[in-house]
């Protein structure tokens, strides 16, 4: 009887471990993103889409710029236009920063008006041309 109980308990423990945690879907998706040099400035432009089922307000796009070997160098923020994004809506961002000559690629992050980090799909890295 004890042996059966031990086998039953071990089986239940093993069955409980098979469940894998399902990752949450992204809140936003990068539709387009580009960076181009112009004189002493790098201009970042792009479009993002709200992929969450909820509206997003006062979203900030964070541009993380990297030197070779993915070495972090600079982070800048830009507000989306418009401020309110219904599910499925798209918004543009535009940002400029001084060109140090070392930056080669960038990635995007986002946060809402309450400084909550948003999950972003297709966020890079993108080349700086």
Kindly label every feature range from the protein language model.
Residues 7-17:
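Hydrophobic h-region of N-terminal signal peptides that target proteins for export
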Residues 1-6:
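Bacterial N-terminal signal peptides that target proteins for export
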Residues 26-27, 58, 68-79:
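Short beta-strand and strand-turn-strand segments in soluble, beta-rich domains
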């Amino acid at each position: 009887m004890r042996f059966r109980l031990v086998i039953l308990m071990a089986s239940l423990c093993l069955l409980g471990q098979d469940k894998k945690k399902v990752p949450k879907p992204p809140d936003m998706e990068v539709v387009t993103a580009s960076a181009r040099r112009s004189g002493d400035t790098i201009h970042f432009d792009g479009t993002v889409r709200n992929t969450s089922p909820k509206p997003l307000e006062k979203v900030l796009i964070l541009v993380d710029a990297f030197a070779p070997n993915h070495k972090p160098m600079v982070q800048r923020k830009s507000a989306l236009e418009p401020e309110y994004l219904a599910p499925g809506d798209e918004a543009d961002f535009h940002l400029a920063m001084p060109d140090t000559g070392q930056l080669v690629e960038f990635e995007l992050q986002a946060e809402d008006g309450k400084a909550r980090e948003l999950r972003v799909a297709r966020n890079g890295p993108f080349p700086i041309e």
